[in-house]
Amino acid sequence: MSEGGAARTHSGWRHVPPIEPPPTRWVMPSTGPIDDSDIVAVGADLEPGTLLSAYRSGLFPMPFDRRRVAWFSPDPRGVLPLDGVHVSRSLRRSLRRYVVQFDTAFQRVMEACADSRRPGGWINHQFVAAYTQLHELGWAHSVEVFERGGRELVGGLYGVRIDGLFAGESMFHLANDA
């Protein structure tokens, strides 16, 4: 067994029910934005119970300023239906250079997504700590892309799986098509 109770295989994880954290002390607002920025609230914390309550309410967090968190609910929301996805022949060829794994390098993916040299970077150490806690409880997951035959992490993403939804939070790539 590993952190969060997910049994590991050589290529990733098999599903083990996540651990429900204590409930949040915060009341989540309705999903209607207060202005054109898609922000519905500012404040609260990044405790696991708060994050899960927010996701269940259709909200996600981003830093607002140095100390506060803003809660967003964009309308319309980007949704990628996965049934019927077409992967081109050239992309399939390109993907042969890589190995894809799940939940084997969550912290490394978070750190790569949080790299301050990335344009538009917004992930700070509080978010890394908060989502690492969610990962340890079995709610947050990562997809890692390694160069075939090596241990170099060249791409990945992380997000939260909850109630049949995977909410991708951030991703990075250091190589084409990774």
Regions found by a protein language model. Give the residues of each.
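N-acyltransferase acceptor-side catalytic subdomain
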Residues: 1-178
